[in-house]
Amino acid sequence: MSYTATEMQAMQLAINAARQAREAGDTPFGATLVSAQGDILHVAPNRQNTTGDCTAHAEVVLVREVTQQLGADRLRGASVYASGEPCAMCSGAMFWAGISRVVFAASTQDICDALGGPVLPARCAEVLEPAQPAVQVEGGLLRDESVATLKGR
């Protein structure tokens, strides 16, 4: 699959946010929102440890912050670029927010190999496959760089 310069930049921003999360003491994940028109709108890191909120995964933080700062309508039809494959909770949150496309770097297996457990084995595409309206899910964009970030490199 080939990606545009904006898509590559969006994933790079998500990986940079993952590095920032690690430096802050959080699990190294980040996410970027790109509008339906192709504009990069927002970037968010994981904030589970720093907030004490087990739901503060990067994708959920992204949805919350965009809703609060830009309005929920900016989420509809947009794409999320995630440094790691979104979990079931994040996949559901993105669906309910109206996200139409999810692109991730490191797969669930990559994450398990790099970080260990706990593991919720439901993969993003499996969670979203029966969704109506459909949500497109793609993986592997900048995978090696994201895996290196997960491993602390």
Language model segments and positions:
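Immediate flanking context of iron-sulfur cluster ligation sites
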Residues: 72-85
